[in-house]
């Protein structure tokens, strides 16, 4: 699943499309979609992935302060797989986006293999 395909899929889920509008300046529309989603919940098989994001770009546009918590856990055992809360410089965003996408794709692949 590509990045664009993932977004198209997420935007078909009503619960994921109710983020409030916030006045934050981003470089691109894609960046805005990726980094601000309020509360987003996506169910995949027995796993639930929750993304919570609040972001602010400073007036000087040099730093991107992001508090992003990613919680992935098995709905049956409630075992938590991953959490993270970080502050990033804007120069780190592209690398982090790539890492998040790769991690999500690997998780999806691993889950699918479990059900083959």
Where are these regions (language model features)?
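Short acidic, low-complexity intrinsically disordered linear motifs used
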Residues: 98-116
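Short helix/turn-capping signatures at newly exposed starts of structured segments
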Residues: 1-7, 90-92, 99
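Charged/polar, solvent-exposed surface patches and flexible loops
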Residues: 8, 12, 83, 106, ...
């Amino acid at each position: 699943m590509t990045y664009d395909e993932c977004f198209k899929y997420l935007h078909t889920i009503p619960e994921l499309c109710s983020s409030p509008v916030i006045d934050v300046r981003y470089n691109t529309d894609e960046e805005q979609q990726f980094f601000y989603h309020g509360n987003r919940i996506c169910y995949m098989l027995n796993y639930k992935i929750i993304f919570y994001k609040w972001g602010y770009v400073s007036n000087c546009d040099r730093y991107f302060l992001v508090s992003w918590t990613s919680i992935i856990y098995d709905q049956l055992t409630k075992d938590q797989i991953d959490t993270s809360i970080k502050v990033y410089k804007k120069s780190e965003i592209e690398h982090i986006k790539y890492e998040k996408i790769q991690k999500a794709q690997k998780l999806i692949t691993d889950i699918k293999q479990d059900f083959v």
